[in-house]
A protein has these predicted regions:
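N-terminal active-site segment of His-dependent metallophosphoesterases
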Residues: 1-78, 146-150, 155
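Conserved catalytic scaffold of divalent metal-dependent phosphoesterases
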Residues: 20-28, 41-43, 87-175
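Beta-strand-turn-beta hairpins that frame and shape the catalytic cleft
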Residues: 25-36, 111-121, 153, 200-207, ...
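Active-site neighborhood of phospho(di)ester-bond hydrolases with catalytic His/Asp-centered motifs
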Residues: 37-40, 63-68, 86-93, 107-108, ...
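Active-site environment of divalent metal-dependent phosphoester hydrolases
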Residues: 42-49, 69-75, 92-99, 112-113, ...
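Short amphipathic alpha-helix with an adjacent loop that forms part of the alpha/beta core around
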Residues: 49-57, 113-115, 142-148, 219-224
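Short, well-ordered alpha-helix to beta-strand connector turns
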Residues: 60, 83-84, 103-104, 151, ...
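Conserved beta-sheet core of the metallophosphoesterase superfamily
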Residues: 78-79, 85-88, 164-225
Length: 225
């Protein structure tokens, strides 16, 4: 009932969270990389042959799995993509043991260097219910991200919070936003929202929402497709 009331509440008194942050302009990394991103398939990949074709015979440097991927989908993914080319995090609908069951390392909180580009990640979503699932309160995400080294690209399941729309499931995490500002991160790639769009924060960070399967090409530190 609480969530229903929050969803139905009009979008009034919205807080512009970005306006509370010091506007540190991003540090561009001026390098190229192609990322195959998979997020929020929820079992659709195993049922959709056209979707499966998107991961056949394409060139990319790294496959980034951003969470909410069904078991059947993982079976398809691992038939087509070698594990050594995959980094994966959990979404809010994933069980904690999922990645281990499929022999994948949990990339949550880790950083990898690809083509001289540092890529890090944070799993899960804002903790909007009491049950245990991959999630953070705003306070927990503060402590988690403070321990992460500087990165050029931050992968996440949830989005950065920009406005408080009183929608705890999809508003995002404040401290993803603060991390992007404080560390001057040029790019954030996330899932969770079930839309595909490219946006930009006020400090210049490009924010790319991935839905299902998308190949993202980055040229000279900017997303171009």
């Amino acid at each position: 009932m609480l969530l229903k009331r929050l969803f139905n509440k009009q979008k009034i008194d919205n807080m512009d969270y970005e306006s509370t942050l010091k506007n540190n302009w991003i540090k561009p990394f001026n390098k190229d990389i192609s990322l195959l991103n998979i997020s929020d398939t929820h079992g659709d990949l195993a049922l959709n042959k056209e979707m499966q074709k998107k991961i056949n015979n394409i060139n990319y440097d790294l496959c980034c799995i951003l969470g909410d991927i069904h078991d059947y989908d993982y079976k398809i993914i691992l038939e087509k993509i070698p594990k050594e080319k995959i980094v994966a995090i959990l979404g809010n609908h994933d069980r904690f043991s999922l990645l281990k069951e499929y022999g994948l390392d949990d990339f949550n909180g880790k950083v990898i260097d690809v083509n001289g580009i540092k890529i890090g990640a944070i799993q899960g979503s804002f903790k909007y219910k009491e049950e245990k699932f991959p999630s953070f309160t705003h306070e927990e995400s503060i402590n988690f991200l403070q321990m992460m080294p500087d990165v050029d690209i931050l992968l996440s399941h949830d989005k950065p919070l920009t406005f408080d729309y009183r929608n705890p499931v999809h508003d995002g995490l404040k401290w993803i936003t603060k991390f992007l500002y404080d560390r001057k991160v040029p790019i954030n790639i996330h899932g969770h929202i079930h839309k595909s769009y490219l946006d930009e924060l006020k400090n210049g960070t490009q924010v790319k929402d991935v839905y299902c399967i998308e190949l993202i090409k980055i040229k000279k530190g900017k997303i171009v497709s």
